[in-house]
Regions:
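Non-catalytic C-terminal accessory region of glycerolipid acyltransferases
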Residues: 2, 6, 11, 50-53, ...
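Active-site metal-coordination segments of metallo-dependent hydrolases
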Residues: 58, 202-206, 264-267
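Catalytic core of membrane glycerolipid acyltransferases/transacylases, capturing the structured
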Residues: 122, 130, 163-227, 252-255, ...
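A conditional alpha-helix N-cap/helix-loop micro-motif detector
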Residues: 147-150, 205, 223-226, 263-264, ...
Length: 341
């Protein structure tokens, strides 16, 4: 029997997958209970080893960063030279954290001044630190999380929820995204009540996928995959929920839209859900601001009134532009190890 006729729930089972599941579950469970200082260092170490030995993946990261740098330099040219205050802020930031060379309080304009090889290594190390630390953050109490994760833009979430149509949250692969399940809890500390859901792609290991899904749902999250179809996630949004969608994934098909000045097939899902539900869209980004310290930023996604919302390409471009700004705010926190362009 050909593999495409076997249900995914059966195709990704078997002894080898079970062994992988036991190992992965053991690692995740360990990361959830270890001190975050240790998991952060372990993650950076794992990232360094990956950078050292994964030569083909380094080439992928290099190509992605070259495209991002070109885009950032173009934005920098449009914005003009940095002010004296911005330059002082950049120097202060660079001296306070050696592992966050890609960040700058003055925005994105200074990023490309660092050597490309330094950027490539930092992408690997931050990817490891963000992944490992994300599991630790996901199991902390809200009070503990606030010591490590700062949220900016909650006022935009509050304003969006007041419209009564739910919220669509545009996500990119960046930062400690496993900590996203803490967003509703942290928002509640500021008087904002919201249920969080997310679109997700099932893992190629049924055992680990089921366990990880149970873990996330135990935190109150609602998870939707392609087997849930179109209506369930839209109904969730309409009921007042906030649905997170990873919108920067590489697509085989989809409307072509500019992404860092490269025309790429783009996921139509955020735009389709926005058109169907009328829910406002917010974009979320992460930035490492110090060792074991992150900033999560929420920004409203806006577009001119004359935009044709019946056009999937127009909606895809709007979403890509929002993702560009978030990723460019801290490029080394982006997960650039997949062939996006």
């Amino acid at each position: 029997m050909s593999s495409h006729k076997i249900p995914e729930s059966e195709r990704f089972k078997g002894f080898a997958n079970w062994v992988q599941y036991i190992l992965a579950r053991g690692l995740v469970s360990l990361l959830q209970i270890l001190p975050i200082g240790l998991t952060y260092k372990m993650g950076r170490g794992a990232g360094w080893l990956s950078w050292k030995f994964m030569s083909k993946r380094r080439l992928v990261v290099r190509k992605n960063l070259e495209i991002i740098n070109t885009w950032i330099q173009g934005q920098s040219a449009n914005n003009g030279p940095p002010s004296d205050d911005a330059e002082e802020a950049r120097k202060a930031d660079s001296s306070s954290i050696s592992s966050a060379k890609c960040n700058s309080p003055s925005g994105i304009r200074h990023y490309s001044s660092f050597p490309l090889e330094t950027q490539i290594r930092e992408v690997f190390q931050r990817a490891g630190a963000n992944l490992f630390s994300g599991f630790t953050l996901s199991r902390m109490s809200p009070e503990q999380v606030e010591d490590y994760l700062q949220i900016e833009g909650l006022k935009y979430l509050d304003a969006a929820l007041l419209q009564g149509k739910g919220v669509i949250l545009l996500l990119a692969h960046m930062g400690p995204w496993e900590a996203l399940n803490q967003l509703p809890v942290l928002a509640s500390l500021h008087g904002i009540k919201v249920t969080f859901g997310a679109m997700y792609r099932p893992l190629n290991n049924t055992y680990f996928d089921n366990w990880l899904k149970t873990q996330r749902e135990a935190c109150g999250d609602r998870l939707f995959s392609r087997i849930d179809g179109f209506h369930k996630p839209v109904d969730f949004i309409r009921s007042g929920g906030m649905l997170g969608i990873l919108a920067d994934q590489k697509m085989r098909e989809g409307p072509l839209a500019s992404y860092f000045r490269v025309e790429v097939p783009t996921s139509p899902i955020p735009g389709l859900f926005h058109r169907r539900s009328g829910a406002p869209m917010l974009a979320m980004s992460f930035a490492t601001v110090a060792p074991m310290r992150w900033k999560m930023t929420l920004t409203p996604v806006t577009y001119p009134a004359e935009v044709d919302l019946s056009s999937r390409a127009a909606l895809a471009l709007i979403c890509n532009q929002a993702l560009e700004q978030g990723l460019a705010s801290s490029p080394c926190d982006g997960f650039w190890m997949h062939k996006r362009f």
